[in-house]
């Protein structure tokens, strides 16, 4: 295995998808290697069940977002996000893959997102959802520290 110093730094291949009506920002960690993509949009790996779950929940059809048996429909995914006010992005802008796979366990974040910059583009955003531990850890590391909340019960 190569050391992180000899592995290439990958820049994020997609820009944030931020519809004007974004109320919810969904953040993952980083896309899988391009060889695993079935569309040019977020969660492109046909093995990932996110689009199937959303199809089942919103349309009672786990195949709703499938264009073919081996590809998701980028157009349907984007239309859904626009309709529901869902923005999508990742918490890492540059990474090093310690192994040539999609596992968050083997991603080294070089440059995290700037949440202030992203949120400034979506003033109606009410919530942020992260899709995994790596995304959560990366997001938290970019936020300023906060004081302990005051307890009203002693």
Q: Predicted segments — roles?
A:
Residues 150:
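C-terminal edge-of-domain segments
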Residues 2-127, 133-147:
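A polyanion-binding, active-site-adjacent surface
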Residues 153-154:
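Conserved small/polar residues in nucleotide/adenosyl-binding loops
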């Amino acid at each position: 295995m190569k050391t992180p110093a000899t592995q290439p730094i990958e820049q994020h291949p997609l820009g944030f998808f931020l519809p004007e009506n974004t109320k919810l920002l969904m953040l993952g960690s980083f896309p899988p290697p391009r060889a695993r993509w079935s569309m040019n949009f977020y969660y492109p790996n046909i093995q990932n069940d996110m689009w199937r779950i959303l199809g089942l929940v919103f349309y009672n059809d786990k195949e709703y977002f499938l264009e073919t048996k081996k590809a998701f429909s980028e157009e349907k995914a984007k239309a859904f996000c626009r309709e529901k006010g869902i923005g999508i992005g990742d918490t890492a802008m540059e990474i090093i893959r310690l192994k040539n796979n999609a596992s968050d366990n083997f991603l080294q974040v070089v440059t995290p997102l700037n949440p202030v910059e992203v949120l400034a583009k979506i003033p109606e955003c009410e919530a942020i959802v992260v899709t995994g531990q790596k995304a959560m850890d990366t997001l938290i590391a970019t936020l300023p520290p906060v004081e302990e909340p005051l307890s009203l019960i002693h």
